[in-house]
């Protein structure tokens, strides 16, 4: 113990010799050992107090700014509601536009279908194919197919189509009550077109037809248009000495003259004389087309009345089907067509060109065989089948015009 005391005294003496600064540092460290804990606690207390103050102030600020936030939130909600409302309005408007467009499209489509039926499309196709075939007959070589020829052909075709629509439209105007029985699907009989609309269409296409004919300057074309107008009007108009469709012979004569004679001769002359500037000269194909189409047009004129017997009888139309009965008229029509095909086969066999001979003989033979096969199974009492067979005869009519240019 004495040794320990002596060592401590020696250490104190050494520190004293080193200087008072070291002694004060050691003594200061000894003094701060207890007071440091109190300082930390005091500092922690001050921090807690400051935090509490900040919390109170933040709470006060939050309370002060809460109305603004509520207002801002309310504004945001109102804006969202407004956007939703605008979106709904836009959707409704878009839906209205779509519905309006669909309604307009449906209405336009309905009117176009009605106009298509008003034009009697099977007659339109017959006019197009017939005039096209006849217009090819004067052509001698590929050099004849020029822009001038195309222009002359289109003028004749457009004028003839407009006159065709006038004739069939006029017939519908005077046959509304009859068509309600015989052809209830036609637009005037079905009420899809008003009488005023029918009159407007008929007059418009008549004016267009004559305008095109006058502009072309073709005498044969104008002759064809004038005769078609006169015969078509006499066939349908209810007036003294008119309404020729009441009489079987006059009705058949109108159709035969226009379809068989006028179309072949007038449009052939238009292309050869007016367009090609050549002297008018008949050809073998032209003579054959005229004679064959006389038979075919007579069949069309007679057969078209077979499904219309009921309405024609009720309104006093004395067609051959009303007088003789549908069965007899049907047998007569089939006999005429088969005889015409037989004659066409003989004419084709007399051709000096092998290719033309093969086409005309085989073509007419095939058409005759098809006709005979279908005619065997037809029930005349079935109006729907008779109407379908009538459309089949028109298809044979179209096919014949494809064979006529090969008859040479």
Curated annotation (Swiss-Prot):
EC number: 2.5.1.116
Disulfide pairings: none
UniProt keyword annotations, A-Z: Chloroplast, Membrane, Plastid, Transferase, Transit peptide, Transmembrane, Transmembrane helix
One cellular-component annotation, GO: chloroplast membrane
Transmembrane segments: 122-142, 149-169, 194-214, 217-237, 248-268, 286-306, 329-349, 352-372, 386-406
Enzyme's top EC category: transferase
Pathway per the UniProt entry: Cofactor biosynthesis; tocopherol biosynthesis
Segment annotated as transit peptide: 1-68
Stored Pfam families: UbiA (PF01040)
Subcellular location: Plastid, Chloroplast membrane
Keyword Transmembrane helix among record annotations: yes
Reactions that this protein is recorded to catalyse: homogentisate + (2E,6E,10E)-geranylgeranyl diphosphate + H(+) = 6-geranylgeranyl-2-methylbenzene-1,4-diol + CO2 + diphosphate
A single MF term (Gene Ontology): homogentisate geranylgeranyltransferase activity
Annotated family: Belongs to the UbiA prenyltransferase family.
Note: Seeds of most monocots are enriched in tocotrienols and contain only small amounts of tocopherols.
Protein name: Homogentisate geranylgeranyltransferase
Record organism: Triticum aestivum
Lineage summary: Eukaryota, Viridiplantae, Streptophyta, Embryophyta, Tracheophyta
